[in-house]
């Protein structure tokens, strides 16, 4: 018993002498927990404030806020077409730009008949480079361009290793993804500055968050658009221009054609129409957003996860999408 009592007394003495260290470790643990938890709580609040609260109120008057006409590039498919329809539902006149005249005319007629707004179509193949911009500049001259949506984009046929990407596709990514957005902004921006109002929305991609294997050139071009938009916002916010970098993840579009798994999860990959309804509600509120609540959750995971985990997940998903695309071609 004496040995037991001696051990118990020794334990109490050690515990008493270490109590200050235990308290210090508890404080460090509390500080670390708060440091990790507070940003997550703030991000969750921002998600609710951005994606849900604005949709509870009345629709904003986009014509009064920005101007009467909206220009949308890449307007015959996917997000571009849906965004054009959503802006038309707010009463804006729509200028549609794409390379497929027949589809342009069909979309323009549908928008004009459905929403009773004016429409104008401009046929332009952005992959042809510099020569196409003079006619666009002339067509937009003296118009009250309130909103520009840069959605035109070139995409891989399916995820591929860079050495397997056709050279024409690489040039398309440079001319369509990078040059088109830059020059369209250069065309409409002077008029917006003169009127002291306007909005520029440039559609980037969730693949710009971190290096994305098997979409190397595409994700790099979208990273350019993200940085370009954010820099423009700093340059022109004081002049009344709102610039938004829109960073969607997958939508169920014929342009991106996600695999069957994503098509079975509409909350992960919404339809272009649902996506556009949510994205337009963030206009004037967030300078950099995914545009859709579940995409914002995916973006938060991407921001907080280590790069090696992102690369592993991207490789896993893109291998699956490539395998599915190749098997459908066989």
From Swiss-Prot:
Subcellular location: Mitochondrion
Keyword annotations from UniProtKB, A to Z: Acetylation, Mitochondrion, NADP
GO cellular component: intermediate filament cytoskeleton; mitochondrion
Region Required for mitochondria translocation, annotated ranges: 2-82
Keyword rRNA processing on entry: no
Record: residues binding NADP(+): 74-80, 125, 222
Highest taxon in the source lineage: Eukaryota
A Pfam family: adh_short
InterPro entries: 17-beta-HSD3-like, NAD(P)-bd_dom_sf, SDR_fam
Keyword Ubl conjugation: no
Modified sites of kind N-acetylalanine: 2
Main subcellular location of this protein, as a coarse class: mitochondrion
Subunit annotation: Interacts with STYXL1.
Family: Belongs to the short-chain dehydrogenases/reductases (SDR) family. 17-beta-HSD 3 subfamily.
Annotated protein name in UniProt: Inactive hydroxysteroid dehydrogenase-like protein 1
Species of the source: Rattus norvegicus (Rat)
């Amino acid at each position: 018993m004496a040995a037991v009592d001696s051990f118990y007394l020794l334990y109490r003495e050690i515990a008493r002498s270490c109590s200050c260290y235990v308290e210090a470790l508890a404080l460090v643990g509390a500080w670390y927990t708060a440091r990790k938890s507070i940003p997550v709580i703030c991000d969750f609040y921002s998600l609710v404030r951005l994606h849900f609260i604005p949709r509870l109120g009345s629709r904003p008057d986009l014509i009064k806020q920005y101007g009467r006409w909206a220009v949308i590039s890449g307007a015959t498919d996917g997000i571009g077409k849906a965004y054009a329809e959503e802006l038309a539902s707010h009463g804006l006149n729509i200028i549609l730009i794409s390379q497929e005249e027949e589809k342009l005319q069909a979309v323009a007629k549908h928008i004009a008949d459905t929403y009773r707004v004016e429409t104008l179509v401009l046929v332009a193949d952005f992959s042809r480079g510099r020569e196409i911009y003079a006619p666009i500049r002339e067509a937009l001259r003296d118009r009250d361009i309130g909103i520009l949506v840069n959605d035109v984009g070139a995409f891989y046929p399916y995820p591929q290793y860079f050495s397997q990407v056709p050279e024409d596709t690489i040039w398309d990514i440079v001319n369509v993804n990078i040059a088109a957005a830059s020059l369209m902004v250069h065309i409409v921006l002077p008029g917006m500055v003169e009127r002291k109002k306007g909005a520029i929305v440039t559609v980037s991609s969730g693949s710009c968050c971190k290096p994305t294997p098997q979409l190397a050139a595409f994700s790099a071009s979208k990273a350019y658009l993200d940085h370009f938009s954010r820099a423009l916002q700093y340059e022109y916010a004081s002049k009344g221009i709102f610039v938004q970098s829109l960073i969607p993840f997958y939508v169920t579009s014929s342009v991106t054609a996600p695999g069957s798994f994503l098509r079975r999860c509409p909350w992960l990959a919404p339809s272009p129409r649902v996506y556009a309804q949510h994205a337009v509600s963030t206009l004037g509120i967030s300078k950099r957003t995914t545009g859709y609540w579940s995409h914002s959750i995916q973006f938060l995971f991407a921001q907080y996860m280590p790069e090696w985990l992102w690369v592993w997940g991207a490789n896993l998903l893109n291998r699956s999408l490539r395998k599915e695309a190749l098997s459908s071609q066989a």
